[in-house]
Amino acid sequence: MAASAAVFSRLRSGLRLGSRGLCTRLATPPPRAPDQAAEIGSRGSTKAQGPQQQPGSEGPSYAKKVALWLAGLLGAGGTVSVVYIFGNNPVDENGAKIPDEFDNDPILVQQLRRTYKYFKDYRQMIIEPTSPCLLPDPLQEPYYQPPYTLVLELTGVLLHLEWSLATGWRFKKRPGIETLFQQLAPLYEIVIFTSETGMTAFPLIDSVDPHGFISYRLFRDATRYMDGHHVKDISCLNRDPARVVVVDCKKEAFRLQPYNGVALRPWDGNSDDRVLLDLSAFLKTIALNGVEDVRTVLEHYALEDDPLAAFKQRQSRLEQEEQQRLAELSKSNKQNLFLGSLTSRLWPRSKQP
């Protein structure tokens, strides 16, 4: 009985395992050939990707077309508006049209030529000075006209823009401004010629010169715009170039007349600065010596990195030479006096009866 029960249990377990294997085989699909599997995979991927790629490929191109159309419409509308606004005849105070040289042309040609002329004149206004004579004629007697003209830049020469947490942005006055104006006003006609706009510079000049030493003020619109720089053309000042000195911290500012300028280093806001005092001594020396043409003097300092330092060195050297000459002259005078007294003692003059 025990042996038969063991055999029966083994047969039952074998039948169970066989049924499981049969079910597994029936559930597993039969193997396909490699070519057939690849074809089916490509079809499936095509079906899966087809509907997704179509919107992605057509969407950006459609958006680009719409953007181009809008840009074209805006550009055309802007061009038409500009031609319409700036292409009309100018009008007088009563609203009547002022005739010009384009009245005989067709209407469209009139509009285009007037628009072109407007922008050409505007560009010329930016590049060229506002007038060929920026200053009025020199004063005549009985009024006093200083013999020389001093042209000063405002920013970097007289003022420094700085920022602090307590005050924010502000312009700081350079030490020695009052001394410079007081010493040079009788000898030089002082003109502020700055590359700043008038709206910015006018109140600054008022604060720098409360006593009215500055004769004239010129701003950015009076400069000549060249290669990205605002150039100060001395030929437009209505003054003799031989007696004009330009002081700036940029050599490009007087590039048209390089031997009329003194290039200083930009002031960094140091309160112990003494450059304006040295500048006053330098310009005062030129004026007191009655130099006929300042260019002959300034030409010697044109290649110097620091013209005022070079002037001080030459001045100290000349003072040493002058002291040495005076010492030698005093020594020779003492020797002559000693020989004269010795001669008078050895050969006394005969007394007149």
Curated annotation (Swiss-Prot):
GO cellular component: mitochondrial inner membrane; TIM23 mitochondrial import inner membrane translocase complex
Domain of life (superkingdom): Eukaryota
KW Transport (keyword) present: yes
Disulfide linkage: none
Record-linked Gene3D superfamilies: HAD superfamily/HAD-like (3.40.50.1000)
GO molecular function: protein serine/threonine phosphatase activity; protein tyrosine phosphatase activity
Alphabetized Pfam families for the sequence: NIF
Residues carrying Phosphoserine: S45, S341
Start and end residues of each stretch annotated as Disordered: 22-60
Keywords for this protein: Membrane, Mitochondrion, Mitochondrion inner membrane, Phosphoprotein, Protein transport, Transit peptide, Translocation, Transmembrane, Transmembrane helix, Transport
UniProt transit peptide range: 1-44
Mitochondrial intermembrane side: 87-353
Membrane topology reported for the UniProt record: Single-pass membrane protein
Localization, UniProt: Mitochondrion inner membrane
Presence of the UniProt keyword Transcription in the record: no
TM helices/strands, residue ranges: 66-86
Quaternary structure (record): Component of the TIM23 complex at least composed of TIMM23, TIMM17 (TIMM17A or TIMM17B) and TIMM50; within this complex, directly interacts with TIMM23. The complex interacts with the TIMM44 component of the PAM complex and with DNAJC15.
Family per record: Belongs to the TIM50 family.
Official protein name in the record: Mitochondrial import inner membrane translocase subunit TIM50
Organism lineage: Eukaryota, Metazoa, Chordata, Craniata, Vertebrata
